[in-house]
């Protein structure tokens, strides 16, 4: 399956938060003009990308072009001269200025190094800084994808039910692997689903992911509200893998309508949009709420009947609609699981029981102790860079 012209341009590359913003036209001619300056005896090369300094090992050669901006920095496409492949390099500037951001970077590195799956983005390299003592910027090299689902859905690229099936299947196939490693992604949304022109899909941006037994729930970052499950909106502390399935349901609805399903302006509005579609939960659906206050709050909200999905999604195939109704369930314990979703008739033509691998070992993030300073994290990331580049570059 292909998309015409790679679908919608813009690259949402691995951008932490806010998804990267594709560059839209206007710079085509300028791309060739970004010239590199060799530094450190020719072992590194420095590029000035529209005022952003980009210093990478000299095996990364032009053409260099900016493909996205995340909350944490700029992302450029550049060529690895040794493999002749184009890669994406994310610069995280001043990565060790505060503990939360430093830990987020470390977490993404450790998680993606642990994982190996077609539908999960992989890290190809971590650039070894020229000097350990001046190590402030982290450069992570990923495989390059052409675009992301957010940009594709906002483009005028026609999409069929086959596209929808294939995207959904790949998200679930990747998520099965992620969940089998005891990891919850927690931030699935269209801009974190990376695509190429062949419609291959990879899950990106694991900066907010958590293992299932970690309990610092949701303290440091606000996950995009629109894709957030009811139990997160209601501050439920014991959430499960079902939070990611809710997000996949929101994404499935958005693939078909090309509009966000629940674009809440604040969390009260968010809950209202959800209950207007799936109906207000009855008491038997509130067992997951440990807090009486939360239960009282939900009961005090305006009550809505469940909407007919056929009326809301007139163009959606009946298979997709049935799966969507099983994903958008208020009670997380009654929501379809990733394994059940892969077995759903809607995905029967793609489902391949022996080709949906799980992760051989659970991931554990051993760096949560509060005593870990920014300097400690810098040392751990430095060692990760040395694993990719054991020898100093001569």
UniProtKB/Swiss-Prot annotation:
It catalyses: L-seryl-[protein] + ATP = O-phospho-L-seryl-[protein] + ADP + H(+); L-threonyl-[protein] + ATP = O-phospho-L-threonyl-[protein] + ADP + H(+). SMART domains: TyrKc (SM00219). The keyword Kinase applies. Induction: By infection with rice blast fungus (M.grisea). GO terms for biological process: intracellular signal transduction. The phosphorylation on Tyr-221 activates the enzyme. A conserved Thr, which must also be phosphorylated to activate the enzyme in closely related sequences, is replaced by Met-219 in this sequence. GO terms for molecular function: ATP binding; MAP kinase activity; protein serine kinase activity; protein serine/threonine kinase activity; protein tyrosine kinase activity. Its EC number is 2.7.11.24. ATP binds at residues 67-75, 90. Residues 61-347 form the Protein kinase domain. Keywords: ATP-binding, Kinase, Nucleotide-binding, Phosphoprotein, Serine/threonine-protein kinase, Transferase. The modification Phosphotyrosine is found at residue 221. The keyword RNA-binding does not apply. The active site is at 187 (proton acceptor). InterPro entries: Kinase-like_dom_sf (IPR011009), MAP_kinase (IPR050117), Prot_kinase_dom (IPR000719), Tyr_kinase_AS (IPR008266), Tyr_kinase_cat_dom (IPR020635). Belongs to the protein kinase superfamily. CMGC Ser/Thr protein kinase family. MAP kinase subfamily. Residues 1-31 have a biased composition (Gly residues). GO terms for cellular component: cytoplasm; nucleus. SUPFAM superfamilies: Protein kinase-like (PK-like). Residues 1-33 are annotated as: Disordered. This is Mitogen-activated protein kinase 2.
